[in-house]
Each structure stands twice: as C-alpha cells, then as structure tokens.
Regions:
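Active-site microenvironment for binding and transforming phosphate-containing groups
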Residues: 1-249
Length: 249
C-alpha cells in the first residue's frame, strides 16, 4: 500500500512493499527539471537544493546520485560508481551500495524494482514507447541474466502516472501497446470514439507475465492530482519533473 511520508518537510510517496531499501517517489515539493537551459537561475538553485535533499535523505554524496539521459527507449544500463553518464537510457539497474539512482517523470509510468534476496534493484521509465518496448519485463530479465534474480523475489512499485481515466491515444499507439500483453481487451476502452489505455496496468501485466508477483500500483493519476505531481499533458509540456528514487541498504 502506498502512503505519504516526508523528507525535510517535503512530501514523498512510499510503499510498504519495500522495507529493506530506500525507495520512494517525490512530489512537486521536490522539483527537478528535465531541461535546465529552460529555467532561470533561482529555479536552478532550488533544483540543486532539492537534489541535495534527496542525497541527504539517502546519506550519500552528490556525485553518487546517478541518473540517465532519458530518451523514451527501452535501453537498460547497469550502474557503476566510476561511470557518471548514462546517455540514451530509460532504465538503470543498481547493484552497488552507497549509490543512489533517480529517474524523472511527468505522466510516464515510473517503475521501481527490488530483489529482496539479491539486494539489487532498478528503476524504469515507461512512457508509451517504453511500454511498447516492454521495458518493465526487459529490466526484470536484465536482473535475471546479470544477477541471478528470481522473479518471485522481485517487488515492483508502479508509481504515479497518467491514469486510465485520462490517457487517450491514437490508433498507432493502441496497436503497438496491444501487442505487448495477453488479454489486452481489459486494458483499453473506447469512449465517445476515443481510445483510452491503462498504462499502469499494462506494465503490471508485463511484470506478471515474466513472473513478478508482488506489485503495488499507485492509485494517483498525475493529471487528476496535478497539485501533487507534474503532468506533461496538463501543464503545456512542462519541463519540471517528479522522480523515482532508489538506494540499496
């Protein structure tokens, strides 16, 4: 079950499914910017301060907080302390202690994975392109291939994202998503001639089909809860983001 907590008086969203790692989703209280060149210096200072808040909560140095350049792909990388740049990457696998990872979101689906037995984890960024590319299940497969994870030991948190209520798509996107899981008829609806898809539960189904059983799906829609989370669609392509954060204990 998801619940709100705080770090330095700023709201974050956690799940009681993960107890042995630091895993949470930030809110608008901890603003991060996707394109720093689009913002003024005072906002940039706030964003750097917010990154420090995240680092302090994880008890790590700023240089040990790693994040990729997200490009709406299904490319996955394994983090290493001596590698700071992860270009063209939409999922990071974390196997080292004293490192933190975070990815940024505004409507796309954030997925935190944690293997309780191996003490490794990952964060995946699943927009419609990543979802169509099965980034959730591919990240699990990476954990299996590289670290001998077993799906039954993996916990998945599917965080705040645009909901089934609001995510209408065109025919091309619908067709691509419909090929990623079985029984897709339960994951879309036609309303007044428009196609709506359930992106969070498509990712849940992908995880279930690779064997992940313990999955917590956040009920918050980023459009309907725009006071808590950023929404690309609802805020005229805002450059600001909330984040998914993970550190191993």
């Amino acid at each position: 079950m998801f619940y709100f907590s705080e770090i330095e008086g700023k709201r974050i969203l956690k799940s009681d499914l993960i107890k042995n790692a630091e895993a949470f989703f930030t809110t608008r209280d901890i603003c991060i910017c996707y394109k720093s060149e689009d913002i003024q210096n005072d906002v940039q200072n706030t964003i750097e301060s917010n990154k420090k808040i995240i680092c302090d909560s994880l008890k790590i140095e700023r240089e040990n907080l790693l994040f990729p350049t997200q490009t709406h792909t299904s490319h996955i990388e394994i983090t290493k302390k001596n590698i700071k740049n992860y270009p063209d990457t939409d999922a990071l696998v974390l196997a080292e202690k004293n490192l933190g990872i975070f990815l940024n979101f505004a409507d796309c689906t954030p997925i935190i994975l944690y293997d309780e037995a191996q003490n490794i984890g990952a964060i995946a960024h699943a927009g419609w392109r990543g979802t169509a590319g099965n980034i959730a299940s591919k990240t699990v497969q990476k954990m299996i291939d590289e670290f001998n994870s077993k799906p039954e030991n993996i916990v998945a948190l599917i965080g705040p994202a645009i909901g089934f209520c609001c995510y209408n798509v065109g025919e091309e996107v619908y067709q691509k998503l419909s090929k990623t899981v079985s029984n897709f008829e339960r994951l879309y609806e036609i309303r007044e001639g428009n196609i709506f898809v359930d992106l969070k539960n498509i990712n849940k189904r992908q995880l279930e089909e690779i064997g992940v059983q313990k999955i917590d799906v956040c009920p918050y829609c980023t459009v309907h809860n725009n006071n808590l989370f950023y929404s690309y669609r609802n805020e005229n392509a805002t450059p600001y983001r909330h984040s998914a954060v993970l550190k191993l204990n």
